[in-house]
Every structure is written in C-alpha cells, then in structure tokens.
C-alpha cells in the first residue's frame, strides 16, 4: 500500500515538481548555480502546472456547456410539442362547437317550418268542408223538386186547401259530407209516403 501511494502521487504531479522533489531528497545541499537552475526550473514548473490546470478546467467547462445545451434543446422540444398539442385541441374544440351550432340552427329552422305546415293543413280542411256543403244543398234541392212534382202528378184532382205547407227545412251543416248525403237521399222517401197517405 505504501509503495502504491507514491506512484499515484507521481502520476498526479507534473514531471517538473517530481524532479525538484527528487533532487531535494537526494542532495541536501548544493552550489549557487544549482540553486539558480532550480529557481528557473521552479518558474517553468509553475507555468506548466497552470497550463495543466487550465486545460483540465477548460475541458470540464466544455463538458458542462455541452450538457446544458443538450438539456435546453430537450426542454425546448418538449415545450413546443405541448404548446402545439394544446393549440390543436383548442382548434378541434372550436370546430366542434361551430358544427354543433350549425346543426342546432338548421334543426331549429326545420322544426319551425313543420308547425307552419300543420297550421295550414286544418284551414285547407275547413275550406274543403265549406265547399262540400253547397254541393250537398245543391243535391238536396232537386230531390225536393222531384218530390213536389211527383205529389202533384199522383194526385191531380186534389188541390191544396189554404196555404200549402212549407217545404221541410234544410239539414244542418255537418262536418262530414256522408251524413248530409244520406239525409238528402232520405227526403224523397218521405215525400212518397205523404203522397200515398193522401191518395
């Protein structure tokens, strides 16, 4: 263990410092020329140590700068991705809202048109009923005329004494045309019965 420690120290220290320490251990004293040479060697050794320290520090600085740049690039890429994703979500939401509003407006317009058609339909039905009533009355009048003519022809000898009876009143207007037609068809039968009784 003791032998390995000096080896590690020798590897860590620059060669000028190693030579100086080795010379100091070997020779305890020396001439003035040797001291001058050692002083000059000491100055050059300091510059060498400074250069080594600067190189090591610069290399560490370069590594730190590279790591920070990589980290910043990752952060920027992630932030841009999230921002773009949020914008896309907002656009999708806006488009969905616009489509929903369009569908709702078109449905409201279509629903408004249907009740109008339903309101107009009953009026058309009323008009058709009103048109049917005059036709039914027109069909009724010839039957009354035929009944009066048949009564006069069947009993030519009999004359009306006093004022003649008024004609039967017209049936009340009904909402449907079928009952009115049936009532009109029943009137000639009644006239025939009256003529038979008179004869």
Curated annotation (Swiss-Prot):
Keyword Ribonucleoprotein attached: no
Main location: membrane
Cytoplasmic-facing ranges: 82-199
Biased composition (Basic and acidic residues): 95-106, 124-135
Protein's recorded name: Uncharacterized protein C11orf87 homolog
GO cellular-component term (any): membrane
Listed InterPro entries: C11orf87
Biased composition (Low complexity): 147-163
Region (Disordered): 93-190
Domain of life: Eukaryota
Residue positions with a glycan: 19, 26
Membrane-related topology note: Single-pass type I membrane protein
The UniProt record lists the keyword Transmembrane helix: yes
Keywords, comma-separated and alphabetical: Glycoprotein, Membrane, Signal, Transmembrane, Transmembrane helix
């Amino acid at each position: 263990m003791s032998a390995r420690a000096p080896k590690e120290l020798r590897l860590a220290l620059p060669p000028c410092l190693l030579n100086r320490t080795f010379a100091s251990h070997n020779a305890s004293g020396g001439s003035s020329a040797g001291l001058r040479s050692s002083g000059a060697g000491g100055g050059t050794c300091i510059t060498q140590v400074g250069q080594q320290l600067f190189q090591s520090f610069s290399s560490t600085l370069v590594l730190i700068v590279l790591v920070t740049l990589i980290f910043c690039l990752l952060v920027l890429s992630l932030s841009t991705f999230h921002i773009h994703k949020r914008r896309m979500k907002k656009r999708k939401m806006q488009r969905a809202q616009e489509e929903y509003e369009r569908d709702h407006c078109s449905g409201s317009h279509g629903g408004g048109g249907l009740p109008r058609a339903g309101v107009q339909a009953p009026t058309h039905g009323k008009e058709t009923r009103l048109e049917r009533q005059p036709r039914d009355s027109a069909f009724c009048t010839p039957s009354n005329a035929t009944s009066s003519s048949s009564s006069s022809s069947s009993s030519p000898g009999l004359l009306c004494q006093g004022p003649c009876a008024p004609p039967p009143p017209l049936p009340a207007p009904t909402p449907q045309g079928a009952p009115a037609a049936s009532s009109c068809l029943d009137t000639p039968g009644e006239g025939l019965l009256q003529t038979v009784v008179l004869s």
